[in-house]
Amino acid sequence: MTFNNKTIEELHNLLVSKEISATELTQATLENIKSREEALNSFVTIAEEQALVQAKAIDEAGIDADNVLSGIPLAVKDNISTDGILTTAASKMLYNYEPIFDATAVANAKTKGMIVVGKTNMDEFAMGGSGETSHYGATKNAWDHSKVPGGSSSGSAAAVASGQVRLSLGSDTGGSIRQPAAFNGIVGLKPTYGTVSRFGLIAFGSSLDQIGPFAPTVKENALLLNAIASEDAKDSTSAPVRIADFTSKIGQDIKGMKIALPKEYLGEGIDPEVKETILNAAKHFEKLGAIVEEVSLPHSKYGVAVYYIIASSEASSNLQRFDGIRYGYRAEDATNLDEIYVNSRSQGFGEEVKRRIMLGTFSLSSGYYDAYYKKAGQVRTLIIQDFEKVFADYDLILGPTAPSVAYDLNSLNHDPVAMYLADLLTIPVNLAGLPGISIPAGFSQGLPVGLQLIGPKYSEETIYQAAAAFEATTDYHKQQPVIFGGDN
């Protein structure tokens, strides 16, 4: 059997009843990965040997009947450290880097009995919105292999959407979980900043980065967040977990819930069919008893400019550690120390990474700091205040996840600014440190349209409540790409 149509709870019941073993489930998952990998290129590393060792140990210890994730396979984005498994951030610079520790999120998942089956492809160092900047080649969209899967967590999204795995981890700096979730028709959540430890995450923008879950359904997504969320002394920005169970409100009705619909999220640059889909979703929420009203987030239009100054500045600082000396790629043609630095970085980093390093270095340079980085920080505060004003009166914000559906591979490579604008609707959430989810809300041109729900800090259970209410009364999440197939 392939098991790819079974929910996590159904798989758990099979494991507890011993109808299948963790080893059998892991072997079936590995076969699912291999059979689809040529079409998708969603993995950098398939950790077959390590996964089977983990599965055997779980079978010998026995499945934990009280833990729904015991024995469940998990794919992990390649910028999240995994003990003994290559972690390259999809870059030539880290082509041979094998950590000797697990990221806290991975360690937490393993503590729950989850089995790491591989590392997923991504935009290099999480810098990209299309899944095309990877040193290991572009990932393909699960619905149409001529389209981008979104980025930067391209492989994590495509792997879940295609049925390679049921659950995966990604990271979100400016939309890198939500946008690929939207493009692939699955559920992806960026938690509140600090909810999931960043220890072991290869840093891009440290004030923006957050690890989060991908799953086919809202409840499965919440179950994975339950496993990975924790306060962590190794991450000074992590926060105490305020919610014991992120699934606690799933199944409750949303009568009287106040949902804001920002006019800026449906304005210029939004595909007409995407706009229509979101307006129909808003009407659906009203049918479920929610109150949906138009609001304004006036400073959101500056989000992309603010983000690319702040994120690139933080990246230029974070990536200084990759110098060809301590680990990773070292240029062989260097004759002195300066050449080792220059050549290793020139050859080890891809074009998009180098572009952002240069942009960030410029923004932080003497004479330009006040005009760019400092000003960006001030506008970031205005964006945060916009959200605070709305959340004083509303429970959630509703809008599209992306301005369009997935676009053609290689169509925006020549125009980085156009690609940056694809994150227009997700970036403000990261700038404000808020939680946001993307769920399937319809189709345009045969491709999934994502609906984004945003909440105030630490409101994940309310986001899941509303998302689950929408999911329970629609069928969009049940539709699968051809590559998904079904149970044998």
Swiss-Prot record:
Catalyzed reactions per annotation: L-glutamyl-tRNA(Gln) + L-glutamine + ATP + H2O = L-glutaminyl-tRNA(Gln) + L-glutamate + ADP + phosphate + H(+)
Give the record's GO CC terms: glutamyl-tRNA(Gln) amidotransferase complex
Picking any one GO molecular function of the record gives: glutaminyl-tRNA synthase (glutamine-hydrolyzing) activity
- Give the GO biological process terms: translation
Q: Which cysteines are cross-linked by disulfides?
A: none
Pfam families reported for this sequence: Amidase
> The organism sits in which domain of life?
Bacteria
State the EC number(s). Answer: 6.3.5.7
Q: Which UniProt key words apply to this protein?
A: ATP-binding, Ligase, Nucleotide-binding, Protein biosynthesis
- Asked if the keyword Transit peptide belongs to this entry, the reply reads no
Active site residues according to the UniProt entry = K77 (charge relay system), S152 (charge relay system), S176 (acyl-ester intermediate)
Q: How does it assemble?
A: Heterotrimer of A, B and C subunits.
Its function, per the record, reads:
Allows the formation of correctly charged Gln-tRNA(Gln) through the transamidation of misacylated Glu-tRNA(Gln) in organisms which lack glutaminyl-tRNA synthetase. The reaction takes place in the presence of glutamine and ATP through an activated gamma-phospho-Glu-tRNA(Gln).
Q: Which family does it belong to?
A: Belongs to the amidase family. GatA subfamily.
What is the protein name stated in its UniProt record?
Glutamyl-tRNA(Gln) amidotransferase subunit A
Organism placement in taxonomy: Bacteria, Bacillati, Bacillota, Bacilli, Lactobacillales
